[in-house]
Amino acid sequence: LVVRREALALYEDCKAAKSVRITAVGKRTEEIGAPALYNLAELQKDANRYHSLTAIQVQEIAQGLYEKKLISYPRTSSRLLPKDVYDTLPPVMEKMLSRKEFRQYADTVDLAAPRDSIEAQDTMEHHAIIITGTQPGKLDREEMLVYTLIVGRMLETFMPPCKVEYTTVDAVCAARKFRIRTYRILEKGWLGIFEREH
């Protein structure tokens, strides 16, 4: 209640002042790189965040997709790929980009550029979760949600960075100092895959 009263008093003071003096404006641009490929923990986190699936559900769904030969081994903690697996990706990515929901990104995905998602060593026990390129048959709703997350993350990983402009405005009103922060996306880059906020 005290905070509410103070806020209302501040609002009335500023309303009475009828003017605001801008004392400083600052801008900066930042590039936000694409996220790494999924391991099981990150897949569970995103599936819960965006689709309200539990960790157990995601683990079981991912295991089912693996048994259908649609994705690589899911119970992994790695978010990297060994070079020999990376070298098999171009035809897999082509199949992904032929899907209507991702076709528009065909000219943006760049497999040639070195990425942090590649590991120099030739072998590793279980690499990051990727799709195999086998076309999915009939999947139920939850299977398709998890499968689409994995497809989308693979595309995101090989997309350009997201470019964001941050603006800070310092102002004075009714003898009170205010700082306002906002941002706008200049280039969506990888963030455009699922059209999410950064």
Q: Over which residues does each language-model region extend?
A:
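Core catalytic DNA strand-manipulation module of type IA topoisomerases
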Residues: L1-H198
